[in-house]
């Protein structure tokens, strides 16, 4: 039986950020060496930009269509998405449309799919980036209007339980937002902060919304509020601990 591993990411058009996706892909490919490896990106905008550069990456339906045409019978689809949400819902629907085209089509869970994974992520963040007295660790996620946004306040609790007394969870487009995080920093007397993307890659959001020089970036707004800021410009995909968590997700479906 011909088997394939299809790793599905939102994608990025930032060349350096793509390294973080590829690091996760390598771990996943090594975890299923008997399967032919292929990738797909779900963002139409990113796929268009990459195609214009001569670096095409298929969408999920196109990738599954190609696998079916090649006679593949067993496909393990592992997303690199961090949480359940609108993007995962669409991915799931797109995959379900091909269920009858394969003898077996299995879809993996996102990274932060349960409390155990949140605890592991929190422990990793505190261990790697926990700040000395007077400083703060601020994780910045994407955020969503989907109910799955509750992962972020849950992560705040997990950080504290992991020993991150001055570790804070914020989001670009969800809750907690900038105002909530700044209020906590002020209340706890934090004069310095390390901003770390809580995203697979340090792409557009990290470059602009987190660390950009414009007045609306988190870096600029924190500095305007009197908080000294350093930024880490690598995504979660660069961390071996996170790569291992993705590997565990894949083992659930192969």
For each feature predicted by the language model, list its residue ranges.
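Active-site-proximal alpha-helix that buttresses catalytic centers in soluble enzyme cores
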Residues: 1-254
């Amino acid at each position: 039986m011909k088997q394939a591993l299809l790793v599905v990411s939102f994608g990025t058009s930032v060349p350096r950020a793509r390294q973080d996706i590829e690091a996760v892909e390598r771990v996943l490919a090594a975890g299923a060496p008997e399967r032919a490896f292929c990738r797909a990106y779900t963002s139409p905008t990113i796929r268009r930009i990459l195609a214009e550069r001569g670096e095409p990456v298929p969408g999920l339906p196109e990738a599954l269509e190609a696998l079916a045409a090649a006679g593949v019978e067993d496909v393990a689809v592992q997303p690199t998405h961090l949480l359940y949400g609108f993007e995962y819902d669409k991915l799931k629907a797109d995959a379900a449309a091909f269920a009858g085209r394969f003898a077996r089509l299995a879809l993996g869970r996102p990274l932060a799919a349960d409390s155990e994974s949140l605890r592991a992520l929190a422990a990793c963040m505190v261990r790697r980036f926990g700040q000395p007295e007077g400083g703060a660790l601020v994780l910045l996620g994407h955020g969503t209007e989907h109910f799955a946004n509750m992962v972020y306040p849950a992560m705040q609790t997990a950080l504290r339980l992991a020993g991150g007394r001055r570790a804070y969870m914020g989001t670009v487009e969800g809750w907690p937002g900038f105002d909530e995080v700044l209020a906590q920093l002020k209340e706890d007397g934090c004069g310095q902060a390390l901003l770390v993307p809580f995203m697979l890659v340090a792409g557009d959001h990290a470059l602009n919304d987190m660390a950009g020089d414009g007045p609306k970036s988190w870096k600029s707004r924190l500095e305007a509020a009197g908080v000294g800021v350093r930024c880490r410009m690598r995504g979660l995909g660069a961390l071996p601990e996170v790569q291992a968590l993705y590997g565990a997700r894949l083992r659930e479906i192969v």
